[in-house]
Regions:
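Non-catalytic regulatory appendages
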Residues: 4-5, 10-451
């Protein structure tokens, strides 16, 4: 609930090399202790790392039973959306991802030199955002784009804001791919972060993102665009699916499994509070040990209460400021809207509307959903642009270049997301980018030779 101070229940000192199986032992010990004491745990969130996502899957597999909920597909002819809710004892628990981390992941994928986000008649790429940042009336700062802090919450929020969309539609309406990408993904995060939207409106926003992503994946598959180059990273796609399904998991849990009607505050169901606690620890002792942490706990309780009841509002205009904690910001809070749960029929109607919106957005990008959904698509394959040759049969070219390049892109993305701050780290990242450009030029040269 808003204005309820955070309680630090447990802390454990662990090494950095623990696997998801190792962490599951600790997670289950804590969770089982809560359940045995009849404490109602509704959700478990993580920040999107590979280990933590696997840990969530291990937790779901440990459920004693599951409840399957179906949402009618908005197209009217595709399979229903299946939402699986795991139960531990009598308690259902949703698995969520941190929405602010996902917003930064969307931004980092857009800025990545390893991929080009491709839509039917448009693309979304870094240079478009860089051009916008140079304008005198730009809604974003140059520091948001040049030498950016990849963990800067404010920079990501500004990029996906309504002001940015307004500027683009006014000054760069030709950048349709970028406009639609920022709108759809930004609305998905707003479904979690808004303090006033009706729950039914949030349902429609989340489903719109689900259907748009579904159409996007289908388009790339039909057109034979390799997802490794023209779609968001596999990690980003997995986190997005978890966030979408997790929203409905927690919605059904609060609606159907709470003994009394409780308002749903989705922005509180994240890892933000944990990050805030660690940030405060570093303010007290910059490089603290486990012993330091134990002595800090009384101070942390006081500081958490001060932060919660303080009238200070975080500075949304700050640059390169890293994490921006807004979970205690209750401006515009509408508890009535957050307590009004939609019925199954209302969710089905919202699903139809959401599909219609996703369909319209894709038509705006140049291809109708009817063409994408057709059994035998008339969309031309990218491979059809080139003549058939015996190049693939040449034994000198059997060194699985696609797999090697895919691995190379994964390494480049990991380096970019790690935000290297040392001179050696910056040099390594620059060398990888140069190597990526060289590979791309070599590939293009090969294509021209074949033609």
């Amino acid at each position: 609930m808003p204005k309820i101070p955070t309680i630090i229940v447990a802390a454990l000192s662990i090494p950095e090399n623990l696997t998801s199986d190792d962490l599951f032992v600790h997670l289950w010990h804590i969770l089982d202790g809560f359940l045995q004491r009849n404490l109602k745990i509704a959700s478990y969130a993580s920040d999107g790392s590979n280990v933590e996502r696997k840990l969530q899957r291990l937790l779901e597999n440990h459920a004693i039973r599951t409840r399957m909920v179906s949402i009618k597909h908005g197209s009217g002819f595709r399979d229903d959306i299946k939402i699986k809710i795991p139960f531990f004892g009598s308690q259902p628990i949703a698995t969520l991802q941190d929405p602010k981390h996902l917003l930064k992941t969307f931004r980092n994928n857009l800025f990545s030199g390893a991929r080009l986000l491709t839509f039917p008649n448009s693309v979304a790429l870094f240079s478009q955002v860089h051009e916008m940042s140079q304008a005198d009336d730009s809604p974003i700062y140059r520091r948001d784009v040049e030498k950016l802090d990849r963990q800067d919450d404010n920079a990501a929020t500004r990029l996906f804001s309504g002001d940015t969309l307004k500027w683009l539609t006014t000054h760069r309406p030709q950048h349709l791919g970028l406009i639609v990408y920022l709108f759809v993904m930004g609305e998905l995060i707003d479904a979690y972060e808004s303090r006033s939207l009706l729950l039914l409106t949030r349902v429609q926003m989340v489903l719109r993102a689900h259907y748009f992503i579904e159409l996007w994946e289908r388009f790339l598959d039909i057109s034979k665009y390799p997802a490794a180059k023209h779609y968001v990273s596999p990690q980003c796609a997995d986190i997005t699916r978890t966030l979408i399904h997790g929203f409905f998991q927690v919605l059904y849990i609060y609606r159907d499994h709470c003994s009394i009607r409780q308002p749903l505050f989705p922005w509180l169901l994240s890892t933000e509070v944990v990050e805030h606690v660690f940030g405060m620890c570093r303010q007290i002792v910059k490089d603290f040990t486990m012993l330091d942490f134990q002595f800090m706990v009384p101070k942390l309780f006081i500081r958490m209460r001060e932060a919660l009841f303080s009238t200070h509002i975080s500075d949304g205009k700050a640059r390169a400021s890293g994490y921006n904690h807004t979970y205690a910001d209750n401006r515009g809070l509408d508890i009535a809207a957050l307590s009004s749960y939609p019925t199954d029929s209302e969710i089905a109607e919202a699903s139809t509307r959401a599909y219609g919106e996703a369909e319209s957005l894709f038509a705006l990008l140049g291809v109708s959903a009817a063409d994408i959904e057709a059994e035998s698509s008339t969309l031309p394959s990218v491979r059809s642009w080139f003549y058939e040759t015996s190049y693939e049969d040449d034994p000198e070219n059997e060194d699985q270049p696609e797999e090697e390049q895919y691995d190379f892109q994964e390494v480049l993305e990991c380096l970019e997301d790690s935000n290297p701050s040392t001179i050696m780290g910056d040099k390594l990242l620059r060398d990888f980018r140069y190597a990526n450009i060289a590979l791309s030029v070599d590939e293009q040269t090969t294509m021209y030779v074949l033609i």
